[in-house]
Swiss-Prot record:
Pfam families: Zn_clus (PF00172). The keyword Chloroplast does not apply. PANTHER family: MONODICTYPHENONE CLUSTER TRANSCRIPTION FACTOR-RELATED, OLEATE-ACTIVATED TRANSCRIPTION FACTOR 1-RELATED. Transcription factor; part of the gene cluster that mediates the biosynthesis of the phomopsins, a group of hexapeptide mycotoxins which infects lupins and causes lupinosis disease in livestock. May play a role in the regulation of the production of phomopsins. It comes from the Eukaryota. This is Transcription factor phomD'. Keywords: DNA-binding, Metal-binding, Nucleus, Transcription, Transcription regulation, Virulence, Zinc. It comes from Diaporthe leptostromiformis.
Length: 469
């Protein structure tokens, strides 16, 4: 539009739609919204083209102070003011200056702005109470900088905490803090503490409207596990032993007494884990898989003992017989011969005895001797007693496998009574097949112990004999 030879550009949207932050139909001279609401439609000057154009919410008393003092600027602004003198006699001011609008039009404007704010936020419904038209102008303008979000939830209409529709529409989505941007800090969704969520974050408590999908915000934390579940330590022994057996190679260099003590500890820890009663009745006892793995390690250790026990015993007997022969040779040399030959022979015999004693001490470090108080056991008796000791320890493993069988049978019966039992039978069948494999492997290892027993021992204890399952 050209006024007095100068091009004047107006805003794309009218002042009323621009104030309410809604889309304007841009129809001249009256847009659809202003025509529907029965208000005056005014298109102000464009701020991009006319830098000296006053803002929409600026009172007329402040416009004269913002005009530049110059001949060129004054002539241009004078032409612009003259061009809009007929249509801008009554500017549509923002809610921050209520005395510029008649009371009837101001009430209609507040209703329009509240409806526009609700239309701009279809998913959330802010509890807003329109404020009094006679409120203090300073307090109303200060709300834009210091707004209390609690009024959005409680719906209070006090002059100090009320919010105008424009501020409610612009600030309806708060900036999330670190507790909301971190996916692992979502307490209500991961069972965390939600006592402070409703106080520190009131914006999350707004009620959803029926226009969008329903969003259910949990108001209480999920039920926490009972203290007995959090304090359960029945499976700690199995976990610790499985972690220590990953190396495998270092355990083979242990002495026999240390190996048997560790195997006994594995058996006791497995029995404790199977006897745990802290789990839920409808949950799958995953710890049984860890117990089965530990039993497999125990069977491997017994297999190693069965394959290496004759070799160890024979080497131990050879060391003991060699040391005794060296002692006899030293005694015979010392009892006969001259002084020079005696000294030479004694040095050689002493060296041989020291070497045998060193090898004997190393053998004793790996293979401790069996004794019963002051009773000295013969070599053959010690071999026989060690073999029986292996079988006695292995009998504890067989008792553990029997307990595993009873446990899985009870688990099968319990899962059969639940709704949709086929959903749990796969886990029970997997555990049962693992048990069958462990029993078969244990039978083969026990057969190795019986084959490696000392020759000529026909009076074996019937309780230690192999019985097929």
């Amino acid at each position: 539009m050209v006024v007095d030879g100068k091009t004047t550009r107006l805003r794309a949207s009218c002042n009323a739609c621009n104030e309410s932050k809604v889309r304007c139909s841009q129809r001249k001279p009256t847009c659809a919204r202003c025509e529907r609401n029965g208000v005056e439609c005014i298109y102000g000057l464009s701020r991009r083209t006319h830098k000296d154009a006053p803002p929409i919410s600026m009172p007329p008393s402040q416009r004269s102070h913002n005009h530049p003092r110059g001949a060129s600027r004054s002539s241009s602004s004078g032409g612009d003011t003259k061009a809009n003198s007929n249509s801008s006699s009554n500017w549509h001011m923002s809610p921050n200056v209520p005395f510029m609008i008649p009371p009837q039009q101001q009430q209609q404007q507040q209703k329009d702005e509240a409806a526009a704010a609700a239309a701009a936020t279809p998913r959330f419904q802010c509890m807003y109470t329109p404020q009094d038209a006679t409120a203090d102008t300073v307090n109303r303008a200060g709300l834009l900088l210091d707004m209390d979000f609690s009024s959005l939830v409680t719906g209070s209409s006090s002059p100090l905490t009320s919010v105008d529709p424009l501020s409610a529409a612009v600030t309806r989505f708060p900036t999330p803090g670190a507790e909301h941007t971190n996916p692992w800090a979502l307490g209500p969704f991961f069972g965390g503490n939600t006592n402070n969520n409703s106080i520190n974050n009131p914006d999350w408590t707004r009620q959803p409207t029926t226009m969008g999908p329903m969003i259910t915000v949990p108001t209480t934390a999920p039920p926490s596990p009972s203290p007995s579940c959090t304090e359960c330590s029945c499976h700690a022994g199995v976990t610790e032993l499985l972690s220590s057996m990953r190396g495998g190679g270092d355990d083979r260099r242990l002495s026999l007494d240390a190996q048997l003590a560790k195997l006994k500890r594995c058996i006791v820890s497995s029995e404790t884990s199977m006897g745990c009663a802290h789990g839920r009745d409808d949950a799958e006892p995953i710890h049984i898989l860890a117990v089965s793995t530990l039993i497999g390690y125990v069977i491997d250790e017994f297999e190693m003992l069965a394959s290496e026990s004759p070799l160890r015993l024979s080497s131990s007997l050879a060391d003991m017989s060699g040391s005794r022969n060296a002692e006899r040779v030293a005694e015979s040399i010392l009892s006969s011969g001259s002084d020079e030959s005696m000294s030479m022979s004694s040095m050689a015999a002493t060296t041989g005895v020291n070497n045998m004693s060193m090898s004997m001490s190393m053998g004793n470090l790996l293979e401790p001797r069996l004794s019963w108080g002051v009773l000295e056991l013969e070599d053959d008796d010690e071999v026989d007693l060690r073999q029986r000791l292996y079988l006695l320890s292995f009998r504890k493993l067989e008792r553990l496998l029997s307990q595993l069988t009873i446990y899985l049978r009870n688990l099968h019966d319990a899962r059969a009574g639940l709704p949709e039992p086929s959903r749990h039978m796969a886990f029970v069948m997997a555990c049962d097949y693992t048990r069958l494999w462990l029993e078969k492997k244990a039978e083969d290892v026990k057969r190795m112990f019986l084959v490696a027993r000392p020759a000529g021992d026909e009076t074996m204890d019937p309780a230690l004999m192999f019985t097929a399952h």
